[in-house]
Design a protein with these regions (language model features):
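Residue-level detector of conserved catalytic or cofactor/ligand-binding positions
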Residues: 1-5, 163-172
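A short glycine-rich, His/Asp/Glu-containing loop-to-beta-strand
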Residues: 4-30, 100-146
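Glycine- and acidic-residue-biased ligand/ion/polar-headgroup-sensing regions
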Residues: 21-41, 50-51, 149-165
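Generic beta-strand structural signal
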Residues: 24, 44, 50-52, 62, ...
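Short beta-strand His + acidic residue motifs that chelate non-heme Fe in jelly-roll/DSBH
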Residues: 35-38, 54, 61-70, 145-148, ...
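Tight coil/turn sites that cap or link beta-strands
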Residues: 49, 57, 140-144, 152
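Ligand-binding loop in jelly-roll beta-barrel domains
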Residues: 57-86, 169
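Long amphipathic alpha-helical segments that form oligomerization/scaffold cores
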Residues: 82-109
């Protein structure tokens, strides 16, 4: 499951304390700042490019609240069902700075590796209950990205088209 929230009126309230169990949540911030606090004692501010990996196991209570006064908040949260044998484990919280992510860069693209491996770049978290592959791919114009999804994996692609051009200048 992927949750993406772009509702400007909605994010101001954030997500006050609420429980999870039996899942892993992987939150990747594209823009903005979020404050995380949970029942394991973990607390911190996620900023653009950072990853929060929460393994809820037998249960965790956490909150995610905006840590910014203005601007747009944009991020993705992937929910991964934990195998039955892991659902009684002690919860864990991992905070990964954006500069710790694996990164592949060539003339056509940048691939930030949140989990898994692309070319020689690897995601920083290796202790997985499943074998996730999670990339943020930035393509140059008219370029493409190809990746063979391993047999047995489920997959999805979220595509966001952003075209950046020079601003038009008007003379008055």
């Amino acid at each position: 499951m992927c949750i993406r929230d772009r509702n400007k009126d909605d994010y101001v309230a954030g997500f006050p304390p609420h429980p999870h169990r039996g899942i892993e949540t992987v939150t990747y911030m594209l823009n903005g700042e979020f404050e995380h606090q949970d029942s394991t004692g973990a607390k911190g501010i996620m900023t653009s490019g950072d990853v929060q990996w929460m393994k809820t196991g037998r249960g965790i209570i956490h909150s995610e609240m905006p840590a910014m006064k203005e601007g747009k908040l944009l991020g993705f949260q992937l929910w991964i069902n934990m195998p039955a044998k892991m659902k009684k484990n002690k919860p864990e919280y991992l905070y990964i700075k954006g500069n710790e992510l694996g990164k592949h860069e060539d003339s056509e693209k940048i691939v930030k590796v949140i989990a898994g491996k692309y070319e020689k770049a690897e995601g920083p978290e290796k202790n997985h209950n499943v074998d996730p592959i999670y990339f943020h791919v930035i393509l140059n114009e008219k370029k493409e990205f190809n990746f063979d999804v391993p047999s047995g994996h489920n997959s999805f692609v979220y595509l966001s088209l952003i075209h950046i051009s020079e601003p038009t200048r008007h003379r008055g």
